[in-house]
A protein has these predicted regions:
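A glycine-rich beta-strand to alpha-helix segment
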Residues: 100-122, 129
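Residue-level preference for the first positions of well-ordered beta-strands
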Residues: 8, 102-104, 141
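Domain-level recognition of soluble alpha/beta enzyme cores
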Residues: 120-159
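Active-site-proximal alpha-helix that buttresses catalytic centers in soluble enzyme cores
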Residues: 2-88, 120-126, 136, 146
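Short, solvent-exposed aromatic-acidic interface loops
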Residues: 158-167
Length: 167
């Protein structure tokens, strides 16, 4: 029996506002972020397909980003995705059910780009890597594939196949 190709989609939250007196964790999306989160959802549906499960930070801006994408799936909100590190995210991914073939992670910088780079193996798309190196802006999407079961995914264990910035 062959292991199915699994797809990991890493979405940085959309552009947020900086209202006075609002804690960082509670910052909402800016109007531009609302628009771009919807564009991100459209792009994911058109280019990746159905998302089976989502891991999302508990921060207001990530929750609002996910809601505005219009992606309906099994969602798990994780406090540890806020102010996180790549290893923490990999640990969360390692715990995802093996029936999930496409997983979306909605998170923050610098973790999202660091994770994408750390997971990318030598066969990754050079153009996508170059664009990611230049900047991983709000609403940016990295798409990686792997033949490893989620429980075995480790750094260098996936191929970066696309990088998109919805505008």
């Amino acid at each position: 029996m062959t292991t199915p190709v699994r797809t990991l989609v890493l979405l940085r939250h959309a552009k947020s506002e900086y209202p006075d007196g609002v804690a960082d964790h509670e910052r909402p999306l800016a109007p531009r972020g609302i628009r771009e989160a919807a564009l991100a959802g459209d792009w994911i549906r058109a280019n990746v397909g159905k998302v089976d499960a989502v891991l999302c930070s508990t921060a207001t801006r990530t929750r609002e980003t996910l809601a505005r994408t219009g992606i309906e799936s099994d969602i798990r909100y994780e406090d540890s995705l806020y102010d996180s590190r790549p290893g923490i995210v990999v640990d969360l991914v390692n715990g995802v059910d093996e029936d999930v073939t496409t997983l979306l992670v909605v998170g923050h910088e610098p973790t999202t780009s660091s994770l994408a780079f750390a997971l990318a193996d030598p066969s990754s798309d050079a153009d996508a890597l170059m664009r990611m190196t230049q900047k991983y802006p709000t609403s940016a999407i990295a798409v990686l594939t792997t033949q490893l079961p989620w429980a075995q995914l480790e750094l260098g264990g996936a191929t970066l196949v696309d990088f998109h910035v919805p505008r």
